[in-house]
C-alpha cells in the first residue's frame, strides 16, 4: 500500500483526524460494549454467558479483519477508513434492536470494521505526518482508543445515574460515532495507489539478517499470552467492580480511568528514547499489567480498583507498540507475515478469554469466585509471558 497523496491538510489536523478515527473505531466500535454491559444485564436482555460470547464474536471479527488487512491489502486507504467508520456507526446503532440473535453478527462485523479502521488509519496518518516532516508526532494518534474509552465510559456512567436503558446507550454511542466521523471526514482525502511506482521495495530497505524460527515462535507466544492476559478485565471491569464494591457510587468510573491509562501509556511510549533491547520494556509492561489485573482481587477496595484500572491501561498500547518493533527487528525481510502471526496469537488469546470466564462463572459457587479464578489465570498468563521474554533475552541477545 502507498499511503502518500497530495498534502491536503497540516499535520495537526491529520493527527486529530487519526485520533478521532481510532476513538470511533476502537473506543466505540470495539470497546463500547464494556461500559454498556452492566446496563444490558440490568435490563435483563443478556446473561453473563451470552455476554461472553458476544465479546468473543467481536474479537473474532477483529482478528479476521486484522489478518485480512495484513495479507490482502486494499489500494485506497482513505476510502477504507471512511467505509469502516460508516460501518461502525450502523453496527453500533443496530445493537439497539430488540433482537438478540442478531447481536453476535453485529459485534462480529463491528470487530472487522474496527480492525480495518485501525490498520488503515495507522498507515495513512503516520505516512501523512511523516511527509510533512513531523514523523515523531505520529504516534499521538494512538491516544485515540484511550480517548474513546474515556468518552464512552463517562457517558455510560451518566446514563446509569439517570436511568437510561442499554438500547438508549447504543443509540447514543451510534450518534457519538456519527459526530466524530463528521469531524474526520473532510481530512480523509488524497490519492492512493496499491504500491509504490518505483524504488526499492519496502521489505528490502532493512539489511539486518533474519533471526531463527525458534526466536520468532517464542516472541509470538510471548505476545499471544498478553491477549488473554488483559481481555477479561477489558471486557468485564464494570461488572467485576459491581461484584466486589457493592453499592459504591464510583463503579462506572473505573473503565474511563483505564482509558486515561491507555492515553498516558501511548504518550509515554511514543516519546521514549531508543532502547537497545525492547524486550526489557515488554517485561516491565507485562509485570505492570499483571499487577493491574490482580490488584482488585488482592486489594478489593476503591483504591485497589482505581490502581488496577490504571495499571491495566498504561501498558495496553505500549505492549503492541514494542512488540511490533520487535517483529520488524527479528524478521526485517518478512515483516507483514510476522506481524500477522503475532496478531493471530494475540487475537486467539482475546477470543478465549471471555468464554473461559463465562465457563468458570457458571461452574463456580458464586459469580465473584468465578471472576476471581479467571483473573488469576489472566495474571498468570502475563507472568508466563515474562518467562518467555526472559528466555528470549538469555538465548537470543541483541547484538546490534
Q: What spans do the regions from the language model cover?
A:
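Helix-loop-helix hairpin linking two adjacent transmembrane segments in secondary transporters
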Residues: 100, 137-192
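C-terminal transmembrane helical hairpin of 12-TM major facilitator-type secondary transporters
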Residues: 277-323
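Helix-to-loop junctions at the C-terminal end of transmembrane segments
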Residues: 65-77, 265-278, 361
Amino acid at each position: 500500500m502507498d499511503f502518500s497523496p497530495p498534502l491536503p491538510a497540516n499535520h495537526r489536523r491529520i493527527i486529530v483526524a487519526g485520533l478521532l478515527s481510532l476513538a470511533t473505531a476502537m473506543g466505540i466500535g470495539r470497546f463500547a460494549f464494556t461500559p454498556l454491559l452492566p446496563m444490558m444485564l440490568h435490563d435483563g436482555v443478556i446473561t453473563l454467558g451470552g455476554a461472553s460470547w458476544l465479546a468473543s464474536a467481536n474479537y473474532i471479527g477483529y482478528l479476521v479483519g486484522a489478518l485480512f488487512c495484513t495479507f490482502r491489502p486494499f489500494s485506497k486507504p482513505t476510502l477504507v477508513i471512511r467505509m469502516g467508520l460508516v460501518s461502525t456507526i450502523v453496527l453500533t446503532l443496530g445493537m439497539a434492536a430488540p433482537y438478540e440473535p442478531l447481536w453476535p453478527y453485529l459485534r462480529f462485523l463491528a470487530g472487522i470494521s474496527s480492525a480495518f479502521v485501525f490498520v488503515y488509519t495507522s498507515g495513512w496518518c503516520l505516512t501523512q505526518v511523516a511527509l510533512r516532516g513531523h514523523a515523531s508526532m505520529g504516534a499521538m494518534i494512538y491516544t485515540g482508543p484511550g480517548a474513546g474509552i474515556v468518552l464512552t465510559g463517562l457517558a455510560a456512567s451518566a446514563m446509569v445515574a439517570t436511568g437510561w436503558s442499554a438500547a438508549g446507550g447504543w443509540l447514543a454511542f451510534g450518534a457519538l460515532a456519527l459526530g466524530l466521523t463528521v469531524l474526520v471526514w473532510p481530512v480523509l482525502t488524497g490519492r492512493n495507489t496499491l504500491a509504490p511506482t518505483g524504488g526499492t521495495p519496502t521489505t528490502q530497505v532493512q539489511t539486518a539478517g533474519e533471526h531463527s524460527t525458534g526466536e520468532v515462535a517464542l516472541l509470538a507466544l510471548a505476545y499471544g499470552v498478553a491477549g488473554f492476559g488483559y481481555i477479561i478485565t477489558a471486557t468485564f471491569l464494570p461488572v467485576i467492580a459491581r461484584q466486589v464494591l457493592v453499592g459504591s457510587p464510583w463503579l462506572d468510573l473505573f473503565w474511563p480511568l483505564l482509558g486515561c491509562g491507555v492515553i498516558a501509556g501511548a504518550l509515554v511510549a511514543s516519546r521514549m528514547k531508543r532502547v537497545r533491547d525492547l524486550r526489557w520494556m515488554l517485561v516491565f509492561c507485562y509485570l505492570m499489567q499483571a499487577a493491574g489485573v490482580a490488584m482488585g482481587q488482592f486489594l478489593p477496595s476503591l483504591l485497589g480498583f482505581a490502581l488496577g484500572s490504571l495499571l491495566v491501561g498504561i501498558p495496553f498500547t505500549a505492549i503492541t507498540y514494542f512488540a511490533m518493533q520487535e517483529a520488524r527487528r527479528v524478521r526485517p525481510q518478512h515483516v507483514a507475515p510476522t506481524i500477522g502471526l503475532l496478531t493471530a496469537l494475540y487475537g486467539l488469546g482475546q477470543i478465549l478469554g471471555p468464554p473461559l470466564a463465562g465457563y468458570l462463572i457458571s461452574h463456580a459457587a458464586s459469580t465473584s469466585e468465578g471472576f476471581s479464578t479467571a483473573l488469576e489465570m489472566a495474571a498468570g498468563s502475563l507472568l508466563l509471558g515474562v518467562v518467555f521474554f526472559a528466555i528470549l533475552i538469555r538465548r537470543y541477545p541483541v547484538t546490534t
